[in-house]
Amino acid sequence: MRYFAEKLGYGDEVDFWGMVGLLHDIDFEMWPEEHCVKAVPLLQEAGVEERMIHAIVSHGYGLTPTAAEPDHEMEKVLFACDELTGLIGAAALMRPSKSVQDMEVKSVKKKFKDKKFAAGCSRDVIRQGAEMLGWELDKLFEETILAMRTCEK
């Protein structure tokens, strides 16, 4: 998320975007069936500002009944990339390098088309996220790979 903040001209909000990225799945491991629902009271109790809570919860749009539609560019990026990072991460593990450093868009496209590969990663959500951003899938794939490379160093 920090990569995207810089790339999209939100350099003054890099830490905010990064924190949203770190916290977005705060409730998933303990309450997968209530993902993006349990996050709200957890984050409120921790004193997290409402703007950040909204951003975190919005990545569950369409998947959980309480998640608002992403409206800020950051929320759209998180929505689009959440499922995609799972697919790219799984694809990286299949490579000899086990890394995204040598990952290419064409490799992601091939895995994206194979519905059995990383089947839990919703291709529909990825497509919807790209549409929200006004991006072609190739651009989303490329930028997400580049973002993941910065986290892997």
Language model feature labels by segment:
Residues 10-115:
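Divalent metal-dependent catalytic cores for phosphoryl transfer on phosphate-bearing substrates
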Residues 100-103, 107-153:
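A structured, mid-to-C-terminal "fold-capping" secondary-structure block
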